[in-house]
């Protein structure tokens, strides 16, 4: 928000609205895409889009065309939706029925730890080098997220046999263990 105001001379509310509106529009289509190509590939595509958005945003200035700025904020929103819609279901797919809570705890611990640490680290970098390091910093870490996703071997979509698909009395474990 401070970056948008001080560096880009944009209303930070508008930049967030653009990103959030794009994410909201993307949530359902992203779910359908993941159903076709898989969650891992969809997340990787989202990480690439987010890295591109952050990488391009690192070169934006107050003199950059508003359309380009808005496009990057929209791309970031779509990318974030692409990642978020698929991440938690992947975690649930990794867990057996009784371990869903444990895996949910791991997921949120890692996610929240990053949300606590990165403002401090990026803040230190911005204090030392200026606000212009924010988007390159973000691009580097989203690029690293891409690398870590390459090592993910499980948690993608599982086909549910047709005879089980309509059975509402079955547990998640019964549906996923053939």
Which residue stretches match the model-derived regions?
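Cytoplasmic membrane-interface "Motif A"-like loop-to-helix N-cap segments
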Residues: 36-48
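Short amphipathic helix-loop junctions that connect adjacent transmembrane helices
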Residues: 1-13
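C-terminal ends and interior cores of transmembrane alpha-helices
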Residues: 49-63
């Amino acid at each position: 928000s401070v970056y948008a105001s001080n560096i880009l001379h944009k209303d930070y509310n508008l930049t967030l609205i653009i990103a959030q509106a794009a994410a909201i529009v993307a949530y359902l289509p992203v779910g359908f895409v993941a159903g076709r190509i898989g969650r891992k590939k969809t997340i990787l595509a989202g990480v690439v889009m987010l890295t591109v958005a952050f990488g391009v945003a690192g070169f934006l200035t107050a003199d950059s065309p508003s359309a380009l700025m808005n496009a990057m904020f929209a791309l970031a929103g779509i990318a974030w939706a692409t990642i978020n819609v698929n991440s938690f279901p992947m975690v649930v797919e990794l867990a057996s029925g009784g371990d869903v809570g444990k895996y949910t705890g791991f997921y949120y611990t890692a996610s929240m730890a990053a949300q606590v640490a990165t403002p401090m680290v990026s803040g230190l970098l911005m204090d030392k080098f200026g606000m212009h390091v924010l988007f390159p910093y973000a691009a580097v870490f989203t690029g690293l997220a891409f690398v870590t996703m390459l090592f993910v071997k499980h948690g993608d979509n599982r086909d549910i046999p047709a005879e089980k698909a309509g059975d509402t009395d079955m547990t998640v474990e019964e549906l996923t263990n053939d």
